[in-house]
Amino acid sequence: MAQSVQERTRLKNKRYESGVIPYAKMGYWNPNYVVKDSDMLALFRVTPQPGVDPIEAAAAVAGESSTATWTVVWTDLLTACDVYRAKAYRVDPVPTAPDQYFVYIAYDIDLFEEGSIANLTASIIGNVFGFKAVKALRLEDMRIPFSYLKTFQGPATGVIVERERLNKFGRPLLGCTVKPKLGLSGKNYGRVVYEGLKGGLDFLKDDENINSQPFMRWRDRYLYVMEGVNRAAAASGEVKGSYLNVTAATMEECYKRAEFAKEVGSVIIMIDLVIGYTAIQTMAIWARENNMILHLHRAGNSTYSRQKNHGINFRVISKWMRMAGVDHIHAGTVVGKLEGDPIIIKGFYNTLLLPKLEVNLPQGLFFEMDWASLRKTLPVASGGIHAGQMHQLLHYLGEDVVLQFGGGTIGHPDGIQAGATANRVALEAMVLARNEGRDYFNEGPQILRDAAKNCGPLQTALDLWKDIAFNYTSTDTSDFVETPTANV
């Protein structure tokens, strides 16, 4: 005699609890969980939907970013499900937002493919950000275990080797993005590069959206740029470079452009964040194998990193990109035109440069993390900065940084070379003051005025941009301390 539906369900329920049950009761919430050194840890900012318990929301995030689906499935019994389930183990209210919670989640290391940013992110940020139980969700920080970090190559070149290749130590490197970013012919583009490097800069660079457009094809740009680099290097006696953007529609085309850049003598190539994690790792491997510095422009990152309650904090992107193997990444200026709270930006720079991270809640660093001897990634500051801010830039960002003055070089009324010279003289005056033990931050304006007495281009720059400041309150600020904008 055929069994009824009710009888079949009763028999199945003897073997396992079926149906839809709360995530917290399925094992995805465990306040007594003891974190292992090998666990992948993630810190999410969770805004539950009205009426959803924060514990259940935390468990839902853990479940949907690991093994769960919307209902219990019997095939769980074919796995080590107790091991593979992510465990939300701590929920703290956000001090500045009563409807938000910091959720700590631990993942077993076996859930992730070795050496793959793509696989790591497919779990951690894959489906869960569209989950209905949460109103908003942001990945604030991660602790990548030592053993997992060892499966990544890290930066292709690193800060120390880059400085040795350039023979430039003890100061920030100086750069400039060619402006206008679109519309120049190859020959005019190369002229901008030559003028900037001859005036004292270390690098010129392509902007994120210069690839191979009708007004300037990539091969022409590379040839004219390298002519400018070589002439400026010969005239100055310094090693110079210009970031050649190899971003393209396919990996085959990226390789073609990178190989040509190497053939014409470039020391550095550039890619955009929008090419994707797998492509970034692939180009980092190529760069290491070919002794090339790899610059990453974070094009597109603010679409998901800027809003405080939803998306991915840039410190997490910084960790992923250091693992992936980029040598440079834009990481904020504090004083420029782009988003940048001083304390939060300091956390980004520490993430890229320190060999080991300590917990620093004001900076947004929630976990200790040893970088497992991966090389440092050099932060890049660009966007609305000029020579008159040099004391602030050195104070907030330190010396391991590339300071890129685009408009602050090319917008100089006496020309590109004069703009470059103004920046170089301002930097060297400030570094000298620092080395002499002076309070260069508070004395900065006077130090610059004194240097300008012997440098007409610097005086012109100070006169032109003296009143320029971008005093907007940052969108992404610390949850634990109040910080004013840097220029106030």
Curated annotation (Swiss-Prot):
Modified residues (N6-carboxylysine): K205
SUPFAM superfamilies: RuBisCo, C-terminal domain, RuBisCO, large subunit, small (N-terminal) domain
Functional note: RuBisCO catalyzes two reactions: the carboxylation of D-ribulose 1,5-bisphosphate, the primary event in carbon dioxide fixation, as well as the oxidative fragmentation of the pentose substrate in the photorespiration process. Both reactions occur simultaneously and in competition at the same active site.
Listed EC numbers: 4.1.1.39
Active site (catalytic residues): K179 (proton acceptor), H297 (proton acceptor)
HAMAP family in UniProt: RuBisCO_L_type1 (MF_01338)
Protein name: Ribulose bisphosphate carboxylase large chain
Alphabetical list of PROSITE patterns matching this protein: RUBISCO_LARGE (PS00157)
Organism: Cyanidioschyzon merolae (strain NIES-3377 / 10D)
Primary gene name: rbcL
Family under the similarity heading: Belongs to the RuBisCO large chain family. Type I subfamily.
Required co-factors: Mg(2+)
Catalytic activity: 2 (2R)-3-phosphoglycerate + 2 H(+) = D-ribulose 1,5-bisphosphate + CO2 + H2O; D-ribulose 1,5-bisphosphate + O2 = 2-phosphoglycolate + (2R)-3-phosphoglycerate + 2 H(+)
Keyword Zinc: no
NCBIfam families given in the database record: PRK04208.1
Entries under Pfam families matching the protein: RuBisCO_large, RuBisCO_large_N
Cofactor note (record): Binds 1 Mg(2+) ion per subunit.
